Amino acid sequence: MGVVIVTGGSRGIGADICRLAARRGYSVCVNYLRGEKEANEVVEGIMESDGRAISVKADVTIEADVSRMFDEATSKLGPITALVNNAGWGGQHGPIESWQIAATRKLIELNLLGPMICSREAVKRMARKHGGQGGDIVNISSAAARTGAPGVFVHYAATKGGLDVFTTGLAKEVAKEGIRVNAVRPGYVRTEMYEEDLRQSPDWVRANIASIPVGRIAEVRDVSAVVLWLLSAEASYVTGSIVDISGGRDTQ
């Protein structure tokens, strides 16, 4: 199938994308920054099922780290054919007056600049004009990009809105290079980030969950399955698309 790099692949949605990608035949680079133990467990699980995987520590906001990650993945697994920009952070909840600028800057760098740096490196290697064979990029956005999340995390929502615009623009820019770029916009997913949202803003979270038409929050596989479809040949005519995965809530 090829080689996929999954940023933030040590836990949650990222870890499940890694596992499902391996089952579909991909060789997987599990990126992490702090979750070394968890990343290694994902790799071990893949290898126990006769898959190919490595873990690579890299800060996606640092160009040199990203370049090194791509180099290591290429040397150990082969040419990169797919990238999933999953690494992200929810930040602290609260109205705009409560924001700490240093933390907000970190949020923007991780959620928006990080995917840009990783995508730039991927395009340099995938684009036909650079000797590549094309490839696929999927960005993990959020339903917050549509709602704005007023009073809770407008700064987080803004980073994801920016990621959506980046997705549609880059898709048009690199389509002739054989590269497809898409995104998914999950709503609430049963992950550590969801638990943190519930801890910080329990009433807001519960009210939003009550308005989900299908009557439940998502499991990680609900998201990873769509990501793998977007990476597959079945989605070969799909680019510049943003798929809502929110149980019918926050959709057009």
Predicted regions and their residues:
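A short, exposed helix-loop element centered on a Lys and neighboring polar residues
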Residues: 119-120, 168
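Conserved glycine-rich cofactor-binding loop
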Residues: 10-11
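Short C-terminal tail/terminal secondary-structure segment
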Residues: 93, 228, 239-252
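Substrate-binding pocket helix/loop in short-chain dehydrogenase/reductase
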Residues: 94-99, 103-108, 208
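Alpha-helical segment proximal to the catalytic Tyr-Lys
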Residues: 124, 172-176, 236
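Catalytic loop of short-chain dehydrogenase/reductase
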Residues: 90, 132, 138-162, 167-176, ...
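Short, small/polar-rich loop/turn modules that mediate ligand/substrate recognition or access, typified
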Residues: 78, 175, 180, 238-240
